[in-house]
Amino acid sequence: MKTISAKPETVKRDWYIIDADGKTLGRMAAEIAHRLRGKHKPEFTPHVDTGDYIVVINAEKVRVTGRKATDKMYYSHTGFIGGIKSISFEKLIDKAPERTIQNAVKGMLPRGPLGRAMFKKLKVYGGSEHPHTAQQPQELNI
Protein backbone atom coordinates (compact mmCIF):
# COMPACT_ATOMS: atom_id res chain seq x y z
CA MET A 1 0.00 0.00 0.00
CA LYS A 2 1.41 3.37 -1.05
CA THR A 3 1.22 6.59 0.90
CA ILE A 4 -1.14 9.06 -0.74
CA SER A 5 0.44 12.41 -1.57
CA ALA A 6 -2.03 15.25 -2.19
CA LYS A 7 -1.81 17.16 -5.45
CA PRO A 8 -2.70 20.87 -5.55
CA GLU A 9 -5.38 20.33 -8.20
CA THR A 10 -7.17 17.55 -6.25
CA VAL A 11 -7.43 19.36 -2.90
CA LYS A 12 -11.02 20.06 -1.79
CA ARG A 13 -11.25 23.24 0.26
CA ASP A 14 -14.17 24.07 2.55
CA TRP A 15 -15.18 27.44 3.99
CA TYR A 16 -15.52 27.86 7.76
CA ILE A 17 -16.66 30.83 9.84
CA ILE A 18 -15.45 31.51 13.38
CA ASP A 19 -17.06 33.99 15.77
CA ALA A 20 -14.22 35.51 17.83
CA ASP A 21 -16.57 37.01 20.43
CA GLY A 22 -15.13 36.15 23.87
CA LYS A 23 -12.50 33.73 22.48
CA THR A 24 -8.90 33.77 23.73
CA LEU A 25 -6.58 35.10 21.02
CA GLY A 26 -3.78 32.52 21.16
CA ARG A 27 -5.96 29.42 21.46
CA MET A 28 -8.14 30.55 18.59
CA ALA A 29 -5.13 31.49 16.42
CA ALA A 30 -3.56 28.05 16.99
CA GLU A 31 -6.71 26.28 15.75
CA ILE A 32 -7.01 28.65 12.76
CA ALA A 33 -3.36 28.01 11.77
CA HIS A 34 -3.95 24.25 12.13
CA ARG A 35 -6.92 24.41 9.73
CA LEU A 36 -5.25 26.81 7.26
CA ARG A 37 -2.37 24.37 7.02
CA GLY A 38 -4.71 21.40 6.47
CA LYS A 39 -3.34 19.26 9.31
CA HIS A 40 -6.85 18.17 10.29
CA LYS A 41 -7.28 16.30 6.97
CA PRO A 42 -6.16 12.72 6.34
CA GLU A 43 -4.60 13.73 3.00
CA PHE A 44 -2.30 16.35 4.63
CA THR A 45 0.97 16.73 2.74
CA PRO A 46 3.64 19.10 4.14
CA HIS A 47 4.70 20.58 0.79
CA VAL A 48 1.15 21.13 -0.57
CA ASP A 49 -1.39 23.71 0.58
CA THR A 50 -4.25 21.43 1.69
CA GLY A 51 -5.95 23.86 4.09
CA ASP A 52 -9.42 25.37 4.16
CA TYR A 53 -10.69 28.95 3.97
CA ILE A 54 -11.37 30.57 7.34
CA VAL A 55 -13.58 33.65 7.89
CA VAL A 56 -13.28 35.28 11.32
CA ILE A 57 -15.96 37.75 12.45
CA ASN A 58 -16.18 39.98 15.56
CA ALA A 59 -12.39 40.38 15.75
CA GLU A 60 -12.89 43.47 17.92
CA LYS A 61 -14.35 41.27 20.70
CA VAL A 62 -11.40 38.87 21.01
CA ARG A 63 -9.86 38.75 24.47
CA VAL A 64 -6.47 38.12 26.03
CA THR A 65 -5.70 36.87 29.53
CA GLY A 66 -3.82 38.61 32.30
CA ARG A 67 -2.39 42.08 31.74
CA LYS A 68 -1.64 41.48 28.06
CA ALA A 69 -4.26 44.03 26.99
CA THR A 70 -2.01 46.83 28.26
CA ASP A 71 1.41 45.12 28.28
CA LYS A 72 1.46 43.32 24.90
CA MET A 73 3.18 45.47 22.30
CA TYR A 74 3.23 45.15 18.51
CA TYR A 75 6.33 46.52 16.76
CA SER A 76 6.90 47.69 13.19
CA HIS A 77 9.66 49.60 11.45
CA THR A 78 9.30 52.30 8.80
CA GLY A 79 12.65 51.55 7.20
CA PHE A 80 14.14 54.88 8.22
CA ILE A 81 16.72 55.38 10.97
CA GLY A 82 15.00 55.50 14.35
CA GLY A 83 11.71 54.55 12.72
CA ILE A 84 10.59 51.81 15.10
CA LYS A 85 6.92 52.10 16.02
CA SER A 86 5.09 50.32 18.82
CA ILE A 87 1.41 50.02 19.67
CA SER A 88 -0.28 48.20 22.54
CA PHE A 89 -2.96 45.53 22.14
CA GLU A 90 -5.64 47.92 23.50
CA LYS A 91 -4.85 50.62 20.96
CA LEU A 92 -4.47 48.18 18.06
CA ILE A 93 -7.87 46.59 18.81
CA ASP A 94 -9.41 50.09 18.57
CA LYS A 95 -7.46 51.08 15.44
CA ALA A 96 -7.47 47.85 13.39
CA PRO A 97 -9.02 44.86 15.22
CA GLU A 98 -8.34 42.41 12.39
CA ARG A 99 -4.56 42.92 12.64
CA THR A 100 -4.35 41.29 16.09
CA ILE A 101 -5.69 37.97 14.78
CA GLN A 102 -3.70 38.24 11.55
CA ASN A 103 -0.43 38.80 13.43
CA ALA A 104 -1.09 35.88 15.79
CA VAL A 105 -1.95 33.44 12.98
CA LYS A 106 0.86 34.59 10.68
CA GLY A 107 3.43 33.80 13.37
CA MET A 108 2.11 30.23 13.56
CA LEU A 109 2.33 29.49 9.82
CA PRO A 110 5.45 28.42 7.90
CA ARG A 111 7.70 31.11 6.45
CA GLY A 112 8.06 31.25 2.68
CA PRO A 113 5.79 31.03 -0.38
CA LEU A 114 3.67 28.16 0.97
CA GLY A 115 2.98 29.98 4.24
CA ARG A 116 2.01 33.15 2.35
CA ALA A 117 -0.43 31.14 0.21
CA MET A 118 -1.96 29.64 3.37
CA PHE A 119 -2.27 33.09 4.97
CA LYS A 120 -4.22 34.42 1.96
CA LYS A 121 -7.03 31.99 2.82
CA LEU A 122 -7.67 33.80 6.13
CA LYS A 123 -10.34 36.53 6.03
CA VAL A 124 -10.75 38.60 9.21
CA TYR A 125 -13.47 41.19 9.87
CA GLY A 126 -13.87 43.48 12.88
CA GLY A 127 -17.68 43.40 12.94
CA SER A 128 -20.27 40.69 12.42
CA GLU A 129 -20.75 41.39 8.69
CA HIS A 130 -18.73 39.64 5.98
CA PRO A 131 -18.99 39.40 2.16
CA HIS A 132 -18.57 35.60 1.97
CA THR A 133 -22.18 34.42 2.31
CA ALA A 134 -22.12 33.09 -1.28
CA GLN A 135 -19.49 30.51 -0.24
CA GLN A 136 -21.88 29.18 2.46
CA PRO A 137 -19.29 28.87 5.25
CA GLN A 138 -19.96 26.29 7.96
CA GLU A 139 -19.84 27.46 11.57
CA LEU A 140 -16.77 26.21 13.42
CA ASN A 141 -16.87 26.12 17.23
CA ILE A 142 -13.50 26.37 18.95
From Swiss-Prot:
CDD domains: Ribosomal_L13 (cd00392)
Keyword Ribonucleoprotein: yes
Keyword annotations from UniProtKB, A to Z: Ribonucleoprotein, Ribosomal protein
One Gene Ontology CC term in the entry: cytosolic large ribosomal subunit
Pfam families cross-referenced by the UniProt entry: Ribosomal_L13 (PF00572)
Family in the record: Belongs to the universal ribosomal protein uL13 family.
Protein name (record): Large ribosomal subunit protein uL13
Annotated organism of origin: Saccharophagus degradans (strain 2-40 / ATCC 43961 / DSM 17024)
Annotated gene: rplM
